[in-house]
Amino acid sequence: NKEDECALSSAENYFYSHYTQTKLLGETLKEKILDPDIEVVSFDIFDTLVFRPFTKPHDLFTLLAERTSTAFNLGDKNNVKQLRIDAERIARDRLYVNNKSYDDITLDEIYDVFNEISNLDSSIVQWIKNDEIQLELKYCYTRQYAKELFDLARYTGKKVIINSDMYLPKNVIIQILNNCGYSEYDDLFL
């Protein structure tokens, strides 16, 4: 019917348009990297070099909550997800009140708050924190077009800088980068 044809046409146009825009952006970025006047190329980590197969970042917490509920027979798995979201928000609020110039919170600070606001034993909270790290390591994948740009920058002798404002510990971020094939860079700023 006509309505289905319009919907299909609209979806096809969206993906064609999105693909075309991404391709054009990639070509523009390649030209910039090849520019001899450009000496340094900087890449953000999450959602640029690396992606996670979740619609929203908090979707990882849904999986974390399900695994926690199963491991400890907690029942209400949504409570763990909400506690994790609340702990991050509270940690950020506290940090901002105490030190407005500080960049960002750490995973340890998030889980210190999580421990305060939950009724869970601290050993369970530690397990949840470790599981979150394992899930991040498991579900971070290489973004292929960004890897091509990264490799081009390395190949052309540019100084390559990687940066992120992520709360994960530096050693975990380095492991994610290594797992995704990003081991040769000049500087890492967190």
Which residues fall in each region the model found?
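Conserved phosphoryl-transfer catalytic core
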Residues: 56-98
